[in-house]
Amino acid sequence: MAPFEPLASGILLLLWLIAPSRACTCVPPHPQTAFCNSDLVIRAKFVGTPEVNQTTLYQRYEIKMTKMYKGFQALGDAADIRFVYTPAMESVCGYFHRSHNRSEEFLIAGKLQDGLLHITTCSFVAPWNSLSLAQRRGFTKTYTVGCEECTVFPCLSIPCKLQSGTHCLWTDQLLQGSEKGFQSRHLACLPREPGLCTWQSLRTRIA
């Protein structure tokens, strides 16, 4: 593998020239879905400038992990994550970190590939301070309770109906025009009884 090098303006121009015209699009997930579908969920600071591998056209960001919420077994003996990897082009869902505040903490939910943390534009990456207190509680404690049995089911157009008793209908985008509505910021889809999951309130108190 070719070494990673600082992302220079010439490389940016090359990537722009060879990138397909169609941009990456995806539907942002409910935070619980992001947690359950990710291999690794951490809190970290972006502390370095992006570096690009000119052979694979992947870039990496240096991070400083401050907390891990999911992935202890998947990570194995590795005690720390120092880099996060993403495609170097936005057209293929590459994530571009736009904050220059190196002391700001971010919630990062991603996939592990060969022991390396990978994210895309479609991954859940958000400033920790932008999360509601309920969402913080979900990531630190509660979302995991619903991962095995429950599914957040997006409702994007009418009519939509539940396909299973273990599904919770997510209507934020339909009713409020945003994935950051009430259900996203304050609720989790959790087991009520065997074979049944319902939206349940997340207390604002952090455990």
Curated annotation (Swiss-Prot):
Start and end residues of each NTR domain: 24-147
Annotated signal sequence range: 1-23
Pfam hit, one: TIMP
Matching PROSITE patterns: NTR (PS50189), TIMP (PS00288)
Cited InterPro entries: Netrin_domain (IPR001134), TIMP (IPR001820), TIMP-like_OB-fold (IPR008993), TIMP_C (IPR027465), TIMP_CS (IPR030490)
CC annotations in GO: extracellular matrix; extracellular space
Residues with Phosphoserine modification: 178
Site (Involved in metalloproteinase-binding): 37
A single GO molecular function term of this UniProt record: protease binding
Subcellular localization: Secreted
Record's keyword terms, sorted: Disulfide bond, Glycoprotein, Growth factor, Metal-binding, Metalloenzyme inhibitor, Metalloprotease inhibitor, Phosphoprotein, Protease inhibitor, Secreted, Signal, Zinc
The record's account of how the chain is modified after translation: The activity of TIMP1 is dependent on the presence of disulfide bonds.
UniProt-annotated binding residues for Zn(2+): 24
GO terms for biological process, alphabetical: cellular response to UV-A; negative regulation of catalytic activity; negative regulation of endopeptidase activity; negative regulation of membrane protein ectodomain proteolysis; positive regulation of cell population proliferation; regulation of integrin-mediated signaling pathway; response to cytokine; response to hormone
Region of interest (Involved in metalloproteinase-binding), ranges: 24-27, 90-91
Glycosylation: residue positions: 53, 101
Domain of life of the source: Eukaryota
Disulphide connectivity of cysteines: 24-93, 26-122, 36-147, 150-197, 155-160, 168-189
Family: Belongs to the protease inhibitor I35 (TIMP) family.
Subunit note: Interacts with MMP1, MMP3, MMP10 and MMP13, but has only very low affinity for MMP14. Interacts with CD63; identified in a complex with CD63 and ITGB1.
Function: Metalloproteinase inhibitor that functions by forming one to one complexes with target metalloproteinases, such as collagenases, and irreversibly inactivates them by binding to their catalytic zinc cofactor. Acts on MMP1, MMP2, MMP3, MMP7, MMP8, MMP9, MMP10, MMP11, MMP12, MMP13 and MMP16. Does not act on MMP14. Also functions as a growth factor that regulates cell differentiation, migration and cell death and activates cellular signaling cascades via CD63 and ITGB1. Plays a role in integrin signaling.
Protein name: Metalloproteinase inhibitor 1
